[in-house]
Amino acid sequence: TRKYTGEPYINHPVEVMQIVNTVTDDPEVLAAAILHDVVEDTPATIMNVRIGFTPRVAELVSDLTDVSKPEDGNRAVRKELDRQHSAQASPEAQTIKLADLISNSKSIVEHDPKFAKVYMREKSALLEVLVQGHPTLHKQALDIVSSYYNNRP
């Protein structure tokens, strides 16, 4: 289940795919959108993705998978490593990352305002490097982050 909402976990990957589908109908990009968290959140490995899907889908999922490990340092250090990884990602992977940010931000701001302060600061920094992602989704994500900062008490 999803943290905060108790919804079935699959709802988040489906929502990310639906957001991506507003800007592309490329089946490999949509498959990668569904799979974007599979390596981080399940026992699946990138090798499993390579075996079960096309090389392009596997490459996109690899681009979307955080590279940091707990031993790399504190959260700020780890998120910076992941941000640098995202900066090198393909435009398609960055588009999926933007959709993920859009999907997650709504839930976190609503259900965990204390953590949202940290999370939205991280996402603001991430948006600075997701410049190759689809401009429509980049604007939506930027609007969410801006709205958060403009509406804080």
Question: For the regions a protein language model found, what residue spans apply to each?
Answer:
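Active-site helical microenvironments for divalent-metal-assisted chemistry
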Residues: 1-153
